[in-house]
Amino acid sequence: MSSPPEGKLETKAGHPPAVKAGGMRIVQKHPHSGDTREEKDKDDQEWESPSPPKPTVFISGVIARGDKDFPPAAAQVAHQKPHASIDRHPSPRTQHIQQPRK
């Protein structure tokens, strides 16, 4: 098969159609012109704004102050698993195997 002529490209929805190989469609990525990229970058620089202020957090009607209210050491203690005071071992069981009669 020959490739389509360079001068005339058939486009669908502003881009060339997907190529079909082995029963599956393969999309071919084509780079866009560099002019539009530069224009978009200029627009992005004009519209950049500082990040919005963080909302204040209320806990039980009082403003939370972050780590000052809950120090990391207190949070670490709350997440630790308590240790058992008595070491419990499972009670020994006698195994009874069912055998057929003679």
From Swiss-Prot:
Q: Which residues carry this modification: N-acetylserine?
A: 2
Q: Which GO terms describe its molecular function?
A: ribosome binding
Give the matching InterPro entries. Answer: DAP1/DAPL1 (IPR024130)
Bias kind Polar residues: ranges: 92-102
Record flagged with keyword S-adenosyl-L-methionine? no
Q: Name one GO biological process term.
A: ribosome hibernation
PTM section of the record: Phosphorylated. Phosphorylation by MTOR inhibits the suppressive activity of DAP toward autophagy.
Q: Where is this region: Disordered?
A: 1-102
Task: State whether keyword Acetylation applies.
Answer: yes
Any idea which residues bear Phosphoserine here? 3, 49, 51, 91
Q: Which residues carry this modification: N6-acetyllysine?
A: 29
Subunit comment for this entry?
A: Associates with ribosomes; inhibiting translation. Interacts with eiF5a (EIF5A and EIF5A2); inhibiting translation.
The protein's role, per its UniProt record: Ribosome-binding protein involved in ribosome hibernation, a process during which ribosomes are stabilized in an inactive state and preserved from proteasomal degradation. Acts via its association with eiF5a (EIF5A and EIF5A2) at the polypeptide exit tunnel of the ribosome, preventing mRNA translation. Involved in ribosome hibernation in the mature oocyte by preventing mRNA translation, leading to ribosome inactivation. Ribosomes, which are produced in large quantities during oogenesis, are stored and translationally repressed in the oocyte and early embryo.
| Entry similarity comment | Belongs to the DAP-DAPL1 family.
Designated name of the protein: Death-associated protein 1
User: Per UniProt, what is the name of the gene that codes for the protein in this document?
Assistant: DAP
